[in-house]
From Swiss-Prot:
Family statement drawn from the similarity comment of this UniProt entry: Belongs to the 11S seed storage protein (globulins) family.
Name by which UniProt lists this protein: Conglutin alpha 3
PANTHER family, A to Z: GLYCININ G5, OS03G0336100 PROTEIN-RELATED
Species name: Lupinus angustifolius (Narrow-leaved blue lupine)
Biological role stated in the UniProt entry: Sulfur-rich seed storage protein. This protein found in the seeds of many leguminous and non-leguminous plants is the source of sulfur-containing amino acids in seed meals.
UniProt GO molecular function: nutrient reservoir activity
Length: 585
């Protein structure tokens, strides 16, 4: 009797598990069965020493439908957003200001190195003394950004941002929580390397606390429970480690470990660097060099060039006449090329020797000599042997690992007027960034569309064929209408600066700017998101089909298909006539 009972019990458990899984799938599907869309504003606000962090409630039905979360960071001048990473990719839109972005990509080398001369210059600027025992700094590439840029942050990659401008730096972050890179649940998480930042998504923290209360055994020791309560609020990833273990693992003293974990300091998401941030950067290096060279702009370089020419002429005069006679019809020429200034401020030169050989017909043959030999002598050892083998072996294709990971392009200015994809002088302009213009977006299945509508300009009805879209208003105000598959209007209201609106896939949407214009960015969950303008669809359908489908005359069908612009940017009829009259006058 035991075997049938166990069999039936096992079958019941399997059915319960299957129904639970199906229920989760249906819940995920039903999240996009939205009868009404809402304009979303930030729900949480964290004020730090160097700025403000705002987040949207990730449990909002619209955001759960799109599978994304949003953050907004306002960084004051000299503000530093502490290093952190997430388990999903991010797109950052720079709404205002300028600054620097640092990313520590795992497995990539530190390509920015500090020379001794540049170190002393930096220390002179700060009024510090150089210490010979301190090791010269090196780090990975520093990227600079400005208003209108979009930045792509890979998952699990620590990054930091710094505002070196004179105004506030405002950045809006999209976090793709349902990305395949995220192997955890879709609740947003951010892992900070430093500080004691506050929880950015308190709704997820409440859910975790409720689960822990249900899962906590009743007989748990009081000491262990007290220890867990003491660790609450320590939100950087180093705080949870044992100090002695961390000291041995990182080979540092206990005082340094204490500062890394800083259990008592309340340093939040954004700090202020009072003396300014000093890192290795060609942009900042050139600015320092220009300041130092104001006293003698070009005199020193001219003197060095003149002395070098005199030395070359002296060497040619001292050369034996027999060697010059032996050359006969051969003419030797030294070409010196300056390639700018190095990181340490010193000039470096590369010399190549070109030999011009005159044949019987007066033709010249030019060949470069000694360049490879000089490189071999300078490098020596393994490098020279490897270079020699590469020259002897036939050309082969590179694997592309370093080019695609360590030197990937992560920035593009989507708001630049010169790169507009669609433009109407009286209606506005549209620019897109996808995996064709910014290849790294193809890794994460994301893209963006920038829309700047002029006064009363219209972005005609259209829909996103293969992506959800999330609109963030940068400036101005506009009227937005969204219609679902049942033909019902799920949103028909004004959107203003700082608001979000989710437009699900294939929902038809239209925009019209107000008197002050309408500027927004639309993040999309496909690296090659495609829009289908309604007017273009009508033009692709035969006239007879439209006439019978809508009960229209052929004249009406002709007006429907061919009146107006070919692109979805439309100017109101009255404004278009006024514009034409002004142009004629």
């Amino acid at each position: 009797m035991a075997n049938p009972f166990l069999l039936s019990l096992s079958l019941c458990l399997v059915l319960l598990y299957t129904s639970a899984c199906l229920g989760e799938g249906l819940d995920r599907f039903n999240e996009c069965q939205l009868d009404r869309l809402n304009a979303l504003e930030p729900d949480n606000r964290i004020e730090s020493e160097g700025g403000v962090t705002e987040t949207w409630n990730s449990n909002k039905p619209e955001l759960r439908c799109a599978g994304v979360a949003f953050e907004k960071h306002t960084i004051e001048p000299k503000g530093l957003h502490l290093p952190s990473y997430t388990n999903y990719p991010q797109i950052i839109m720079i709404v205002q200001g300028e600054g620097a972005l640092g990313i520590s990509v795992p497995g990539c080398t530190e390509t920015f190195e500090e020379a001794q001369q540049s170190q002393s210059r930096q220390e002179r600027r700060r009024g510090q003394r150089s210490q010979s025992q301190e090791q010269e700094d090196s780090h990975q590439k520093i990227r600079h950004f400005r208003e209108g840029d979009i930045l792509v942050i890979p998952p699990g990659t620590p990054y930091w941002t710094y505002n070196y401008g004179d105004e506030q730096l405002v950045a809006i972050n999209l976090l793709d929580t349902t990305s395949l890179s995220n192997q955890l649940d879709p609740n947003p998480r951010r892992f900070y390397l430093a500080g004691n930042p506050e929880e950015e998504y308190p709704e997820t923290q409440q859910q975790r606390q409720q689960r822990q209360q249900h899962q906590r055994p009743s007989g748990r020791r009081h000491g262990q429970h007290q220890k867990e309560e003491e660790q609450e609020g320590k939100n950087n990833i180093l705080s949870g480690f044992d100090p002695q273990f961390l000291s041995q693992a990182l080979n540092i003293d206990e005082d340094t470990v204490h500062k890394l974990q800083n259990p008592n300091e309340r340093i939040k998401q954004i700090i202020r660097v009072e003396e300014g941030l000093g890192v290795i950067s060609p942009k900042w290096q050139e600015q320092e060099e220009e300041e130092e060279e104001k006293e003698e702009p070009r005199q020193r370089r001219r003197r060095e060039r003149r002395e070098e020419r005199e030395e070359e002429e002296k060497e040619e005069e001292d050369e034996p006449r027999e060697s010059r006679r032996h050359r006969g019809g051969h003419e030797e020429e030294e070409v010196e090329e300056e390639r700018g200034r190095g990181r340490g401020g010193s000039e470096w030169k590369r010399t190549t020797r070109r030999r011009h050989t005159r044949g019987d017909e007066g033709q010249e043959e030019e060949e470069t000599t000694t360049t490879t030999e000089e490189r071999r002598r300078r490098r020596g050892g393994r490098g020279s042997r490897q270079e020699e083998e590469e020259e002897q072996s036939p050309p082969r294709s590179r694997n592309g690992l370093e080019e695609t990971i360590c030197t990937a392009i992560l920035r593009e200015n989507i708001a630049d007027p010169t790169r507009a994809d669609l433009y109407n002088p009286t209606a506005g302009r549209i620019s897109t960034a996808n995996s064709l213009t910014l290849p790294i977006l193809g890794w994460f299945q994301l893209s963006a569309e920038y829309v700047n509508l002029y006064r009363n300009g219209i972005y005609a009805p259209h829909w996103n064929i293969n992506a959800n879209s999330v609109i963030y208003v940068i400036r101005g105000r506009g009227r937005v209408q969204v219609v679902n598959s049942q033909g019902n209007s799920v949103f028909n209201d004004d959107l203003r600066r700082g608001q979000l609106l989710v437009v699900p896939q294939n929902f038809v949407v239209a925009h019209q700017a107000g008197d002050e214009g309408f500027e927004f960015i639309a993040f999309k969950t496909n690296d090659q998101a495609t829009t289908s303008p309604l007017k273009q669809v009508f033009r692709g359908i035969p006239a007879e089909v439209l006439a019978n489908a809508f009960r229209l005359s052929l004249n009406q069908v002709s007006e429907l298909k061919y009146n107006g612009n070919h692109n979805p940017l439309v100017t109101p009829q009255s404004q278009s006539q006024d514009h034409n009259l002004v142009k004629v006058a």
